[in-house]
Amino acid sequence: MVQERLCPYCMKVLPAQVISCPHCGKVFVGRNPAGSLPVGSMLGGRYTVGEMLTMDGEGILYSGVEDLGGFRVTIKEYLPFTLAAERGEDCILHPKKGSEVLFKTTRMDFADLYHAIQRITPATGLEAVLDVVEANNTVYAVLEDLGGTPLDEWLDARSATLRAEEACAMLRPVFEGVAAMHK
């Protein structure tokens, strides 16, 4: 049985092989930059990739949908720009020539890190890792999507300076989570 995928925008069931959502009208083609996964890609048979949110030297962060439960997730793709050459039309990521061993080793480290975080969350102040998926010659960490406001925006919107006691109280669960990770 083929798993139905959900539109990453309106979360309604998509017919097979569509390039736009018949419900909300959003077009999937060309939404993400070259080298990233296309909107509407399926991972692990249960996650639909949405738009790229950010990218850094380690990889790309996408919005996404968990198709079985119908809830939003964040998908972190391991894509080290210094080691990765290109992504084929089949979405397979290829390492740069001469970087194959380092690419494979660091890919395994990425998977190990997110498996370790998965074991200690959600009991800590860290974002829960729901799944770790290996596909396309790389690894994807599927994270809970809590929504919310980014810290820099929240701080900019505050009229008063954040007191040290407030900052410590807010960050205590994060510190405890990091400490648990290093045990």
Provide a role label for each language-model segment.
Residues 151-162:
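AlphaC helix of the protein kinase catalytic domain
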